[in-house]
């Protein structure tokens, strides 16, 4: 029998009951992901004020925070291998960020190559994956509670070719605690000769 994936991890739904640690996402590539494809349900865009404190009072629970950013949620589609991906949030939340949701609509779920670019357990990881059915590459990077810049070495690209790269990035003002939903989208041309520093906000 062919196994596509299994859960076997504290997935995104646990943030609906209590908050996974801010470094939980950077643990999984070094632990659970070693055993194969994982169902994590990434793609949450409403990262705060998303639940009531009780069914009776229906006051917004301001202490409920998903320790992430929209940029990180998009990166998880590349970092976590899952051949049957999810869009884990409500349509009304995606409708506020349709430019970012376009990435979820278009990102592949199966890959022909994977390159680890940066990694340190519980701290950060970045990787590149090549779409199984095209010549397109995708790069994703995540960090823990500490902001950082990761140098992305594009030497994995085919030599002598130029690629248009669309980037979904945290901003300098993004922070998982108080500004998780700020992001920027930019484009630039890259080749196998390029090294680019990418900023990852806390969370």
Task: For each feature predicted by the language model, list its residue ranges.
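Histidine/acidic-residue-rich catalytic or RNA/ligand-binding cores of hydrolases
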Residues: 1-4, 100
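Glycan-recognition surfaces
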Residues: 3-91
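Flexible loop/turn segments at secondary-structure boundaries
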Residues: 47-49, 86-88, 95-98, 146-149, ...
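C-terminal accessory segments enriched in acidic
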Residues: 56-63, 81, 86, 90, ...
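Conserved, mostly hydrophobic/aromatic
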Residues: 79, 139, 203
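Glycan-recognition and catalytic regions of carbohydrate-active enzymes
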Residues: 92-138, 173-180
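Carbohydrate-binding surface patches
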Residues: 121-161
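C-terminal beta-sandwich/jelly-roll accessory domains of carbohydrate-active enzymes
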Residues: 144-202
